[in-house]
């Protein structure tokens, strides 16, 4: 199994990153993608990936929350990071109209700029969309023929939104959100609709600790070593064998990111 979304640059991991990676290996996680969400964190993510070249890779991008920070200097930084074989995708980029930490037009501008950069560099894109589906698809769609591949990370949308994303050829990233009986019920019902060769799994650690985990870690911090729990839950919802699902989703990740 492969974790496509780990926020390993988070200060929550500052004291024990090596142990976090060790626990993930021991849990059977075969690799992980470290997410970059702004220029600085993208540099930090690549630095961490280089310390574990057989196990960790990174993305480089500007999350919609940080879209107001986008500049020519940011683009130059991401282009430089892309020279490393450990940096395998542009993102996390997209739109988030849930909280609008950057205004929608700033978000759209930064999203377009990163799609252009991904097309220029022939890299996949690692996408974010929350409460912005129609605008998200309208911006993304013209770029798709020019992009190597695209994954919508941490999908939490509706059935029509899922069908729209699949129709456009997107890969779908699923997190422990499906383990939340309060928020994840609709998402749980959508699991059988995702083609096996388009499904990717992720923890989004340290966020989104699976709500149904027992026992819960005292820290309430999510970790990549909990990915097997998500695998089990997704397999159950799809009627799949957990081992086969773990292998298939890991293969999907390695193909998508050319690992």
UniProtKB/Swiss-Prot annotation:
SUPFAM superfamilies: Metallo-dependent hydrolases (SSF51556)
Subcellular location field: Cytoplasm
UniProt feature coiled coil, ranges: none
Its EC number(s): 3.1.11.-, 3.1.13.-
Protein name: 3'-5' ssDNA/RNA exonuclease TatD
Family, per entry: Belongs to the metallo-dependent hydrolases superfamily. TatD-type hydrolase family. TatD subfamily.
GO CC annotation, single: cytoplasm
Stated role: 3'-5' exonuclease that prefers single-stranded DNA and RNA. May play a role in the H(2)O(2)-induced DNA damage repair.
Domain of life, per lineage: Bacteria
Alphabetized UniProt keyword annotations: Cytoplasm, Exonuclease, Hydrolase, Magnesium, Metal-binding, Nuclease
One term of GO molecular function: magnesium ion binding
């Amino acid at each position: 199994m492969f974790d496509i979304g780990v926020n390993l640059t988070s200060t929550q991991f500052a004291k024990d990153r090596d142990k976090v990676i060790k626990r993930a290996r021991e849990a059977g996680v075969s690799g992980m993608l470290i997410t970059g969400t702004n220029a600085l964190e993208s540099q930090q993510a690549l630095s961490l990936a280089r310390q574990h070249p057989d196990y960790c890779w990174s993305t480089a991008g500007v999350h919609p929350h940080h879209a107001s920070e986008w500049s020519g200097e940011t683009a130059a930084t991401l282009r430089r990071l892309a020279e490393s074989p450990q940096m395998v995708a542009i993102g996390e980029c997209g739109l988030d109209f849930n909280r609008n930490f950057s205004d929608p037009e700033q978000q759209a501008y930064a999203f377009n700029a990163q799609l252009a950069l991904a097309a220029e560099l022939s890299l996949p894109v690692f996408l974010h969309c929350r409460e912005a589906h129609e605008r998200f698809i309208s911006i993304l769609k013209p770029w798709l023929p020019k992009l190597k591949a695209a994954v919508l990370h941490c999908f939490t949308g509706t059935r029509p939104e899922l069908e729209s994303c699949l129709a456009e050829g997107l890969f779908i990233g699923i997190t422990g959100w499906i383990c939340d009986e309060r928020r994840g019920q609709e998402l749980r019902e959508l699991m059988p609709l995702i083609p096996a060769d388009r499904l990717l799994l992720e923890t989004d650690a340290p966020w989104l600790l699976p709500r149904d985990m027992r026992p819960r870690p005292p820290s309430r911090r999510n970790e990549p070593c909990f990915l097997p729990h998500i695998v089990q839950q997704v397999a159950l919802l799809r009627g799949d064998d957990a081992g086969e699902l773990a292998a298939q989703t890991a293969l999907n990740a390695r193909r998508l990111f050319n690992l």
